[in-house]
């Protein structure tokens, strides 16, 4: 991503593992690169919030805390955390005082369909659940909230048109609710979509 100038707000890595030691190594590597080249940015390893708390306790250089969030308690429980986990880890990150401007130490990902796929929507539609997720995000004063709605797959968003519609809904809904909203251009390979749709 850096080759294309991506990652100006944050350089993030998805470790594709729940191994805390590996996440710490990635955090240290990113911290070294940022300091060596004096890059005016911050880093985030996209590991579970409880792993990040462990990393902080082990002395890791954590700039941003990541977590995928949903709009119901049951959705977040299915993701393996509660709001108290977000609060405790946010407090731990703030205590590190690594930020140069502001206290925005949280990075969240969301996207329509997660509450439905978890059987945790309580009869609400996808967009209502998504709007509730932005309420959760706003409470924690995040640096960035990103919808990754294309990752939900054709079980909930069948094709490129539906993915684009949902991404626009998410983006505008997030903006209306006052969160720093982004939209990841993504889709699953088994959806009726391709790069030309995005």
Regions inferred by a protein language model and the residue ranges of each:
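Anaerobic metallocofactor- and corrinoid-dependent redox/one-carbon enzyme cores
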Residues: 2-3, 8-198
């Amino acid at each position: 991503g850096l080759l294309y100038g991506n990652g100006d707000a944050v350089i993030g890595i998805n470790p594709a593992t729940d191994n805390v030691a590996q996440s710490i190594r990635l955090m240290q590597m990113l911290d070294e690169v940022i300091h060596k080249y004096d890059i005016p940015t911050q880093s985030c390893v996209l590991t579970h919030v409880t792993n990040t708390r462990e990393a902080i306790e082990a002395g890791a250089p954590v700039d941003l805390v990541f977590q995928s969030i949903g709009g119901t308690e049951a959705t977040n429980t299915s993701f393996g955390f509660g709001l108290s986990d977000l609060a405790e880890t946010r407090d731990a990150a703030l205590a590190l005082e690594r930020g140069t401007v502001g206290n925005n130490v949280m990075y969240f990902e969301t996207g329509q369909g997660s509450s439905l796929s978890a059987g945790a929507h309580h009869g609400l539609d996808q967009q209502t659940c998504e709007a509730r997720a932005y309420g959760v995000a706003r409470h924690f004063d995040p640096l960035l909230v990103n919808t990754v709605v294309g990752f939900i797959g054709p079980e909930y968003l069948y094709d490129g048109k539906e993915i684009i519609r949902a991404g626009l809904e998410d983006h505008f809904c997030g903006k209306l609710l006052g969160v720093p909203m982004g939209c990841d251009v993504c889709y699953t390979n088994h959806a009726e979509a391709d790069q030309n749709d995005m």
